[in-house]
């Protein structure tokens, strides 16, 4: 028999703590609660949603997914044009409300384009290198105040972010049943007035999340859920294999998952001082 060596994965990023994100921490029904077969109340739906996603951890079955690494291929929109990806990596810290998206893609004319998009709490910025300006003189961080809402919506409407935000919504989260499918309505953390409606499949995994905010409708569709972790690190935590994002009907991102790391790798990131200063002006 071959012995497998498991190597811990360390991802060092740096995200600021936000009040909204701190509310989206470990939660959900505790062990000792088991929904009755066919139960359709909110408590049962939230339990089944996180259970079928593999997000309940430990003997107490507490929702304790803190971070996510996600890699994909596909096409995203850049300056209104499709850009085919050669690299797409998302590093998420749910407890800090932070997410960094690194990507490189080719425009229709073949020109290469790269960017690093970051959101952390109530701050959004772009980087020319990972962790720009954290070490003085290293890299450039560009504030992106106008992108804050879009990035927070993407974070909390994601396959894992949605159930976390729904749990954090407390009495503002509701459930209805349409065509024998649970539809969970919840507020998007950190975006006042943004309301999400998540339609779950018969396996209690989000197949569609629609977010309405200030006249803009952002729709996320998900499919082909699986454990996309490396073969040496399968943990039966499931993530969408296909992810499509549309804004007012126009496709913004069309992604196919290649790999995830759902074992709570270390993801942390401070907001650069220049970004904080810009937000205070």
Task: Briefly describe each language-model feature range.
Residues 1-5:
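Positively charged n-region of N-terminal signal peptides that target proteins for export
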Residues 8-16:
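Bacterial N-terminal signal peptides
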Residues 20-22:
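Boundary at the C-terminal end of the N-terminal hydrophobic targeting segment
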Residues 24, 28, 36-45, 121-196, ...:
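Flexible, processing/modification-adjacent segments and terminal tails
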Residues 34, 38, 44-133, 166-171:
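N-terminal mature ectodomain segment of secretory-pathway/periplasmic proteins
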Residues 89-91, 114-116, 174, 195-199, ...:
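Short, surface-exposed charged micro-motifs
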Residues 107, 116-122, 132, 139-146, ...:
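Catalytic loop of the DD-peptidase/beta-lactamase superfamily, centered on the K-T-G motif
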Residues 178-278:
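Gly/Pro-enriched, hydrophobic low-complexity segments
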């Amino acid at each position: 028999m071959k012995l497998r060596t498991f190597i811990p994965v360390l991802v060092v990023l740096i995200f600021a703590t936000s009040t909204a994100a701190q509310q989206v921490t470990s939660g959900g029904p505790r062990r000792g609660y088991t929904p009755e077969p066919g139960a359709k109340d909110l408590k049962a739906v939230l339990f089944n949603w996180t259970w079928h996603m593999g997000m309940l951890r430990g003997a107490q079955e507490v929702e304790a997914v803190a971070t996510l690494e996600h890699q994909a291929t596909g096409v995203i929109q850049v300056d209104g044009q499709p850009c085919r990806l050669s690299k797409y990596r998302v590093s998420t810290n749910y407890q800090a409300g932070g997410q960094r998206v690194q990507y490189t893609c080719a425009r229709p004319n073949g020109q290469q384009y790269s960017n690093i998009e970051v959101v952390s709490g109530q701050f959004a910025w772009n980087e020319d290198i990972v962790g720009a300006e954290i070490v003085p003189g290293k890299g450039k961080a560009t504030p992106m105040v106008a992108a804050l809402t879009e990035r927070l919506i993407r974070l909390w409407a994601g396959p894992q972010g949605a159930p976390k935000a729904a749990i954090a919504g407390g009495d503002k989260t509701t459930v209805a049943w349409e065509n024998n499918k649970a539809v969970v309505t919840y507020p998007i953390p950190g975006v006042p007035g943004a309301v999400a409606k998540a339609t779950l499949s018969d396996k209690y995994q989000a197949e569609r999340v629609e977010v309405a905010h200030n006249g803009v409708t952002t729709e996320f569709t998900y499919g082909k859920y699986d454990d996309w972790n490396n073969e040496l690190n399968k943990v039966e935590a499931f993530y969408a294999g296909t992810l499509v994002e549309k804004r007012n009907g126009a496709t913004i991102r069309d992604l196919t998952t290649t790999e995830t790391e759902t074992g709570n790798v270390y993801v942390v990131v401070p907001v650069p001082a220049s970004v904080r200063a810009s937000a205070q002006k």
